[in-house]
Amino acid sequence: DQMPGQGARHHTATLLQDGRVLVVAGMDNGEIATANASIYDPAANTWTPAAALPLAERRMFHTATLLPDGRVYVAGGEQEDGTVFNGPTWLYDPTTNSWTAAASIGQRTRHSATLQTDGRVLLGGGRASAGVLVASSAFFDPADGTVAPGGNLIPAREWHTATLLPTGQVLTVGGRGAGGSLTSPQIFTPTAAIS
């Protein structure tokens, strides 16, 4: 079966607890960011339209993180003209096929999102408007819907990867910094950065 719509790139694909995959937003063949969402069922090889984000929330280069309670947390991103979101983040509930607005993380796109062992999501780095790189991090807590600041990535970076280590620290690798591609990894402690 084929993906509905015009296809997508710069989207997210998140494995749900029931084995299906939620695909959210991205850029279509017309070079326009979308608000669409679809669910792929690998057991049946079928696609089903899911509730879309509000049209004003169409985006690409965002993150989508599966939470321990089965919801998906969608944060940040930008539109095709480079406008970086500064509004709410979003929670998708697959049991009700619905979206709920959550607290803003400020302007952040091309960032990383790492689920912590305590259920919070660490959002790190990325970029803000006018191409300004972001060094800061923030925690989203799904238990109460709040966002709290974390430490800084050194140097600021976008397009990097972030992996939770058994110690609770996060390894950031690669990405782009002010001088181009970064070759040095960083072990990031959620409240402080260490080289």
Briefly describe each language-model feature range.
Residues D1-S195:
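Kelch-like beta-propeller repeat domains
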